[in-house]
Amino acid sequence: MLSSCGIALEDKPRNLSAELPDTLIEGAITTTEAPSILETVQIFLAKDSEEGSMFLETVEREIEPDGSVKPILEQILNGPTADEQERGLVSPFAEGSSLVGTTLEGSTLLVHLDTLDGFPTDDSASNQLAFAMLVCTSTELLTGIEIKQVLVLLERDDQTTAVNAPVSDGEPPADGEAVRCSNYITYMQD
């Protein structure tokens, strides 16, 4: 017994008069892009206190995670958003420094920069604050990883040089040694 679905057979194909969606037209190119998954992270930015001194304040940012801490630390170098600036948040960083990458050795995070051009150029409170933002974000706010200290390195001409980070508290580290958030207690709120 033969049965059919009720559509008559035709001897040859014919053109359809209905308008087809672009994706069904011959030769159409479709692109489907997976929606980006954002992750909320915290970083430290600087804020002026009522007494005129600066302190670190936690802010949240949305990033596209890549499995490393690099996109988080890049948010610090990017400085405050317009909304954050309206709330009084500032950054001592100027344009000029780029994060090359990060490496974890034990509990020490190695932060590789291409230059210090974006950092304040002296041993001032602004320079200390810049390092405090990087170091304390790394040791206090990054989740899922234990970082106790940070060593900032410069990558130039295929050479790596440790940066002597200026500190606000405690003994200055020996040349090329890592620093901890406890070296920047002055900038932490009670």
Named regions from a protein language model:
Residues 1-190:
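Bimodal "functional hotspot" detector
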